[in-house]
Amino acid sequence: MSAGKTVVIALGGNAMLQAKEKGDYDTQRKNVEIAASEIYKIHKAGYKVVLTSGNAPQVGAIKLQNQAAAGVSPEMPLHVCGAMSQGFIGYMMSQAMDNVFCANNEPANCVTCVTQTLVDPKDQAFTNPTKPRWRFYTEQEAKDLMAANPGKILREDAWPAGWRVVVPSPRPLEIVEYGVIKTLIDNNVLVICTNGGGIPCKRENKVISGVDAVIDKDLATSLLAKTLNSDYLMILTDVLNACINYKKPDERKLEEIKLSEILALEKDGHFAAGSMGPKVRAAIEFTQATGKMSIITSLSTAVDALNGKCGTRIIKD
């Protein structure tokens, strides 16, 4: 029975922007409207829904706009750009959900919560930034940029080609607004939160402040789901299942799988760090901590996956 059960859902980046699409507002809005229609089906099936998403294209565009306009308007730090992206994404998502509710003659019981995520300021990610972001540079441009901006680090990125700024990606430790989110869920509000993994922050001497970093949205969503004691964690991506030997002749889809089995596959290196790896890790951590099912599947198959008909479903041993 789904009645009253909570599912925390991480939307993949393709829910807002497909590969090679122009990142204009209308394109993203139309994609979000499609996603909202699918999320509504989960709500209609009786689940309480908490919705998160990535923000890489959006925060990247905002940061580039800030840099381009720095001569006429002060450039904002990365954590502020992250907050701006949460407002943009939350606006699109909550409006799309409100419209779906209204079209189905239901109250628009949906809200966006700007979310801060605490990290350890001593996390090794701050001394070894690894997450590539924003535009590509030639090698000479990268060297000139680093020479002119001490502390800025660029590294060569193999795909498609060129050099990119790398930023820290510390591990998420706490969702600051957890209590508010829990209250909203308990009152049957569909909550949109933790977009882009949350705004990276630190707490020192009981004072919270932003830090320039990015947080993996799947790990942050897993943390949120654990903290809420959610009944399910669902990570939506552009494939139906996690696979081993992906796109090889011996590719195998993972369907219902025990925690110990997927841990062994992870240890053997079956899940790439830049794609399925973080999603599998996030799912593992949720099921390890709660003993409850985590699901990896596509947006269009979400309800069927909750019903055990498809998707990768990780269960305790």
From Swiss-Prot:
- GO cellular component terms listed in the entry, alphabetical order: cytosol
Keywords linked to the UniProt accession? Arginine metabolism, ATP-binding, Kinase, Nucleotide-binding, Transferase
Coiled-coil regions listed in the entry? none
Q: Which domain of life is it from?
A: Eukaryota
One Pfam family name from the record? AA_kinase
Please give the pathway this protein is involved in: Metabolic intermediate metabolism; carbamoyl phosphate degradation; CO(2) and NH(3) from carbamoyl phosphate: step 1/1
CDD domains named in the record? AAK_CK
Q: Which pairs of positions does the record mark as disulfide bonds?
A: none
Q: What is its EC number?
A: 2.7.2.2
Reaction(s) the record says it catalyses? hydrogencarbonate + NH4(+) + ATP = carbamoyl phosphate + ADP + H2O + H(+)
Q: Which GO terms describe its molecular function?
A: ATP binding; carbamate kinase activity
Biological process terms from the Gene Ontology for this record are:
arginine deiminase pathway
Q: What's the subunit arrangement here?
A: Homodimer.
Q: Which family does it belong to?
A: Belongs to the carbamate kinase family.
Could you tell me what this protein is called? Carbamate kinase
Which classification does the entry list for the species? Eukaryota, Metamonada, Diplomonadida, Hexamitidae, Giardiinae
In the UniProt record, what gene is named as encoding this protein?
CBK
